[in-house]
Design a protein with these regions (language model features):
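Contiguous, well-folded functional domains in the mature portion of proteins
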Residues: 1-183
Length: 183
């Protein structure tokens, strides 16, 4: 193998790694009180009304993050963390039916009562697992970094008393894009 080709491939691999794990400083916009910002970079894939496990109506917002999106996860609003659980698992292609149950995932509940956002991060084909630096009862500030996920799907569950401020197909940036408000 030619040394120039090997040097080129090494440089390309280095650039890809630096790009995938970049951690840009973000200026957190000052939205009105009770605002909810995006937890991950990506594209809004779906917004629907669902019935949650408590039998209450909620909004379900799905964000798909790819390899080219920033992988840093950010806090949706200033609050206390109610739950934080990381479930280790596989990193299979999302087209495989079992991937939904077997892939690594992280469940976090931000806030309590009527001001609560449930977040589920599911990893898809990735060489790096989900990193979560939160634990229960942590006090967190809107836009603060709390973890890392390269190539995955993030589901946000908002209470039905919230107002959603995004549309399907919209590109969102963690900590900067307004997802909605608590009413």
């Amino acid at each position: 193998i030619d040394a120039d080709l090997l040097s080129f491939l090494s440089a390309l691999l280095l650039l890809a790694t630096v790009w995938a794990f970049r951690n840009p400083e973000r200026t957190i916009p000052h939205f009105q009180q009770d605002s909810i910002v995006s937890v991950a970079d990506g594209v809004i894939k779906s917004i629907e009304t669902i019935e949650d496990e408590k039998g209450e109506n909620s909004y379900k917002i799905v964000i798909k993050s790819g390899f080219l999106d920033t992988s840093v996860l950010r806090v949706p609003f200033s609050c206390e963390v109610s739950e934080a659980e990381l479930l280790f698992g596989a990193r299979m292609n999302p087209l495989i039916p079992l991937s939904d149950k077997l892939n690594e995932q992280c469940r976090i509940v931000f806030g309590k009562g009527k001001k609560q956002v449930r977040v589920l991060h599911k990893l898809q084909m990735s060489s790096v697992g989900i990193k979560n630096y939160l634990s229960e009862n942590n006090q967190v500030v809107q836009g603060a970094r709390y973890g890392l996920m390269v190539n995955g799907k993030t589901t946000l569950i908002l209470p039905v008393n919230s107002r959603v401020a995004v549309k399907v197909g919209e590109k969102v940036r963690a900590g900067e894009t307004l997802i909605g408000f608590f009413s």
